[in-house]
Amino acid sequence: MSRPQQAFPPIRDQRGEPHVRRFDEQRWLIDNIIRANGIDWDQPRSLYIHAPCGIEANADFAGIRERVKKMADIGPAFAAVARRREAKANAAALADHKVTARDNFFMAAVHWGAAQWPYDENDETNISYNNKKRECYAKYAALADHHVEAVWVPFKGKAIPAWLHLPPNYTSGKVPVVIAVPGMDSYKEIQVALYGDKFLNRGMAVLAIDGPGDRKSVV
């Protein structure tokens, strides 16, 4: 039995493949959707990015949700909050307020990572946000209430970037390890909570990676 013809057959390119347009060429569509539905138009991104930070970040994300009216607003909105958190962290570090510094370096790293999301090329902005994210997270790691270190996992002649978290009060010996693999819209810096992480609190280590082709793996 023959298949029914499509009412609207795809437009094909010179190779005979369906002609598609790049995301940027259709930006007006997503801008209209964001204007109507907000930053969480397709998934609850502001919620899962917020969650690892805890309640202190409530105002950060409330302000970001209010400011984002189009795709081009996302990066600058998160970057502005990241700068504010980083400045607060640096001031706290100078005053030897280690917990305040630690918490704010963590939140700054989270916001820098979120600011990267709209950029699909390794341009100057994306790379600078990535560097700030890694710098802030390294400063958080130095002050964390458990051991955190940067590691690189060998992969097909290259290496996958990761953060290794050991459970609180770890001294020596083997422990179970959870490998946290974020999706394309996520990143390794939000895979372990600032407080009360469900894996670390159960005595497990966490290896949080950026998968091949994503975030630092690309940069």
Locate predicted features.
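Cap/lid segment of the alpha/beta-hydrolase catalytic domain
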Residues: T171-V219
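Flexible helix-coil transition and linker loops at the boundaries of alpha-helical arrays
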Residues: L94-K98, Y140-L143
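Long, non-catalytic architectural segments outside compact domain cores
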Residues: S2-I74
